[in-house]
Amino acid sequence: MNEHPGFCPACFASLAQEADTCPACGARMADLSKRDYREKIVHALRHPLADVRMRAIIALGLRGEPQTADALVKCAMRHPTDVVQGLEIVNSLARMKQTGAGRTALSILQARHPAHAVREGAARVLAALPSEGEADA
């Protein structure tokens, strides 16, 4: 049997190391370990510990997959008082290839995030990007 952390990887409830099934949500540990890596990282954005979320944010930025932009925005909006996390989400979005998804995500943060620093960070990144017409040329 593989050891797992003290949290259920599905619902993040406290979990005994030797458990095969989560008593809170019924998830089987063996099934969860088979998930796609990107899916695991995106799911970690919902973890209750800020440092786990931060590692997931950084990892997603380094992977640069635009299809994760929406999940990053949702994470920023779920934790509006965590400005450091919000700014790292802006950085992660800036590292992504600036497809429509990346620009849209940054625009949402610029317009809607409660923290002024996050809105300003998103605005700076957007201002530094080439216009969509220039990016296509």
Regions found by a protein language model. Give the residues of each.
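Structural signature of alpha-helical solenoid repeat scaffolds
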Residues: 13, 26-27, 61, 77, ...
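Non-membrane alpha-helical segments in proteins
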Residues: 53-59, 87-92
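Short metal-coordination and nucleic-acid-contact micro-motifs, chiefly zinc-binding Cys/His arrays
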Residues: 1-4, 18
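Cysteine-rich micro-motifs
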Residues: 18-29
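Residue-level detector of extended alpha-helical repeat arrays and alpha-solenoid scaffolds
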Residues: 19, 53, 69, 83-86, ...
